[in-house]
A protein has these predicted regions:
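Transmembrane helix boundary and interhelical junction motifs in multipass membrane proteins
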Residues: 51-56, 89-98, 240-255
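Membrane-embedded alpha-helical segments of transport systems
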Residues: 79, 83-87, 112-134, 271-286
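Interfacial segments of multi-pass membrane proteins
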Residues: 101-109, 253-268
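Extended non-transmembrane interhelical loops and adjacent amphipathic helices
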Residues: 74-105
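Transmembrane helix-loop junction
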Residues: 62, 85, 103, 217, ...
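Predominantly cytoplasmic-facing regulatory/coupling regions of multi-pass membrane proteins
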Residues: 1-78, 138-240, 271-297
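Membrane-interface alpha-helices at helix entry/exit sites of multi-pass transporters
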Residues: 71-75, 93-94, 107-120, 264-275
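Transmembrane alpha-helix termini and helix-breaking/packing motifs in multi-pass membrane transporters
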Residues: 131-142, 261
């Protein structure tokens, strides 16, 4: 195990330890209140989430000239998510997906069909996460009449958008086209193909947010649903940072910071994040089954 991976375990365990010292007793008391009926609902929503995510990967893969069956896309997506939940960095599962679909195992990180399919699929989800957060935060500012904050958010974003559009149309498009992966990238992230996988990413993102909100409801927490809709993407984004194990510790610390904006007690907000993490791991357990079945061949 590399030193950087050990550091990620230390970060996750260290942050959880710090939070448990300060809020441990209250967190345990809150989690004890969980309503199992909501857990069943979360598992059902998660199943739909995996099906949509796997189909998004299959759909994008078609435009990288990689043919993946729908059954295999579901199986490997479960495996990938399970591995991302327990291994450092949050990308080991994606590397596993690439490895098992790459033509030459020695060239796993070459920008080939398998590499492109996984990276572009992840990029589609991350773009939706970012877009959802920006739009929902803007709506939050308008509803709460925070017009100055709204202008500080959107005026720079508009300027950045047109600047990037200018760069893309004049230089970047030509550069991308000159690369062997360029046509695939432009096909996937422009036109009808882009909007189709973007719609899939929207519903996948909504499922993540619904699961987080239901995790809070399952603990009997009285929440402002719209505020949760706005700030949950921040917590989800924190989980994608490659500095921990499956987002553990970082997610809970982000929830602590968000608690001040949501008007929740710190222990309740952290409890919701922990419950979400536990449920996220439970929902990915079919990946362990598929992985063991794969290893037994």
């Amino acid at each position: 195990m590399k030193i950087i991976d050990i550091c990620k375990y230390i970060i996750s365990l260290g942050l959880i330890y710090i939070l448990s010292i300060n809020y441990g007793k209250d967190i345990i008391n809150t989690i004890k209140l969980v309503n199992i009926d909501y857990i069943i609902l979360i598992i059902f929503i998660s199943l739909i989430q995996y099906i949509l995510s796997a189909y998004r990967w299959k759909y994008i893969s078609k435009y990288t000239n990689l043919n993946i069956s729908f059954i295999n896309s579901i199986k490997y997506y479960y495996i990938s998510t399970f591995m991302n939940n327990i291994l450092p960095g949050g990308i080991m599962g994606d590397i596993f997906r690439i490895y098992h679909h790459v033509d030459d195992k020695k060239e796993i990180f070459r920008i080939g069909r398998s590499f492109q399919s996984v990276v572009y699929e992840r990029l589609s989800g991350q773009l939706m996460l970012l877009s959802f957060f920006i739009l929902s935060l803007g709506l939050y500012f308008i509803i709460h009449q925070k017009y100055i904050a709204f202008s500080y958010l959107f005026l720079p974003l508009i300027a950045i958008f047109y600047f990037l559009k200018y760069i893309f149309n004049n230089n970047l498009r030509k550069y991308i086209k000159s690369k062997h992966y360029g046509n695939n990238f432009l096909t996937i992230f422009t036109g009808e193909v882009f909007w189709r996988h973007t719609v899939l990413s929207f519903f996948v993102m909504m499922s993540y947010i619904f699961i987080y909100i239901i995790s809070a409801v399952s603990l009997g927490v009285n929440i402002d649903y719209f505020s949760f809709l706005v700030f949950t993407p921040i917590i989800l984004f924190s989980m994608t940072l490659p500095v921990s194990i499956g987002g553990w510790g970082v997610r809970e610390f982000a929830a602590l910071l968000i608690s001040f904006l949501l008007g929740l007690s710190a222990s309740v907000s952290i409890s919701v994040a922990i419950m979400y993490g536990i449920l996220n791991l439970i929902c990915s357990l079919p990946g362990l089954y598929f992985l063991l079945k794969l290893k037994s061949r």
